[in-house]
Amino acid sequence: KLAGMKYIVITAKHHEGMAMWDTNVASFKDYTGKTMFSLQQYTPFGKTGRDVLMELKTACDKAGIKFGLYYSIIDWNHSSQTINGDFTKMKSMAARTAYIRDMKAQLKELVDRYDPAIMWFDGDWTYRRKAPTLAKWWTKADGKDLYKYVKSLKSSILVNERVCRGFKLGDFECPERSIPEKAPSRPWETCQSMNDAWGYKKDLENSYRSYKYLIRELVDVASKSGNYL
């Protein structure tokens, strides 16, 4: 807040599929198919009954900081999909239909419970322009539909372009670890990490970017009317 932060985006579900809230959507179970794959079921923190997303949401509201949630479209753990490199492959078209339905149910949980100002999608890499296949199972039409669905849950929510990138969808552009030479025509942000990883990597724990590097990027982004996430 003192540094000028206006909003945050916290991971609700990343590619590995663990829900950081007490989801009730039945298909999001662990590899055994018996236990919900969530923070509440898998960690000592969650089993105390605490809700990390709500605690952070409450703190943001108190500080006047907008609260955003990150959600991955692909899910390495979900029974509908198999891991295909960094991507996933659908087991069948019926599984694809059911997964998209259940993904929307999780998104409704998140919007209803936490009232986020931003829904930040990722994991749309398997996209196609036209009809889906099992390997390229996400389409431009799916992205448009997902955007419309989230807006139906909360009309004022901001949604990034990664409902299906490359087609000018969503409310703002979000290049990753890069800054365009010229300011984009639409609202935009770029996302950056403090080191070369988006999560814990033992060999990178002490290789943080210098404050001069980060401030230089922040100034460059701000000079082009962007946000620095």
List PLM regions with ranges:
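Mature catalytic domains of secreted/periplasmic carbohydrate-active enzymes
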Residues: K1-L229
